[in-house]
Amino acid sequence: MAEEQPQVELFVKAGSDGAKIGNCPFSQRLFMVLWLKGVTFNVTTVDTKRRTETVQKLCPGGQLPFLLYGTEVHTDTNKIEEFLEAVLCPPRYPKLAALNPESNTAGLDIFAKFSAYIKNSNPALNDNLEKGLLKALKVLDNYLTSPLPDEVDETSAEDEGISQRKFLDGNELTLADCNLLPKLHIVQVVCKKYRGFSIPDVFRGVHRYLRNAYAREEFASTCPDDEEIELAYEQVAKALK
């Protein structure tokens, strides 16, 4: 007889109305992990302006997101992810860790470069900061278009060409994607709204990656509304003057 699954509840930041999902890439990351694991779980949005007594008791520190697994409370996104990968494991649940270590660091610089770009108000610095973001996107594009070791036929003398894989580590979503995709989504929404900047078409690998990601429910259905992201960056994104 299969062991009964403990109750799993993910507490995430609420949006501007105090109910729908708010802008938080860490919350979306864990939401995606739980969905990909195929586990039964609930998601509770927490209004950061009006925390309920229950939430205060469960997590006095109030750091979101946090996870309730049975009667255990888990905090810190990285530690929660490690915990879920350890307890929700094969054969009952899929392993989500990337096979190639490089997949975990692909695109790692993008969010920092984006933050510097969007927070800048000095027009004289804008071009260089935009170039920094483009350079980080180019590194990701190179990774996505370069074949992974398991795509390379070592017996063939022919050039393997461009990788056609769907995601960072192959044709299935992994923990690496759960980390990167929510941040890439924010970059797209915020840059378009506050800088009129879109990821250039020349980065075909990045565009292919995003198309494949938006076609997956686990990503598309866990994204906050664009308006929530724009609102979160309303005071952060500095006008050039």
UniProtKB/Swiss-Prot annotation:
**Locus of motif G-site:** 24-27
Q: Work out whether the entry's keyword set contains Transcription.
A: no
Please provide, alphabetically and separated by semicolons, the GO molecular function terms listed in this UniProt record. Answer: chloride channel activity; oxidoreductase activity
What are the Phosphoserine sites (modified residues) in this protein?
S121, S156
Q: Which example biological process does GO assign this protein?
A: chloride transport
Residues annotated as domain GST C-terminal: 93-233
How is this protein positioned relative to the membrane? Answer: Single-pass membrane protein
Q: PTM Phosphotyrosine: list the residues.
A: Y233
**Pfam families on file:** CLIC-like_N, GST_C_2
Q: Which PROSITE patterns match?
A: GST_CTER
Q: Which cysteines are joined by disulfide bonds?
A: C24-C59
**Which InterPro entries does this one have?**
CLIC, CLIC-1_C, CLIC_N, Glutathione-S-Trfase_C-like, Glutathione-S-Trfase_C_sf, Glutathione_S-Trfase, Thioredoxin-like_sf
Q: What class of enzyme is it?
A: oxidoreductase
Entry similarity comment: Belongs to the chloride channel CLIC family.
Domains: entry comment: The active G-site contains a monothiol Cys-X-X-Ser motif which mediates glutathione-dependent redox catalysis. Members of this family may change from a globular, soluble state to a state where the N-terminal domain is inserted into the membrane and functions as a channel. The redox status of the active cysteine in Cys-X-X-Cys/Ser motif likely determines the capacity to adopt a soluble or membrane-inserted state. A conformation change of the N-terminal domain is thought to expose hydrophobic surfaces that trigger membrane insertion.
What's this protein's name?
Chloride intracellular channel protein 1
Question: Source species, please?
Answer: Bos taurus (Bovine)
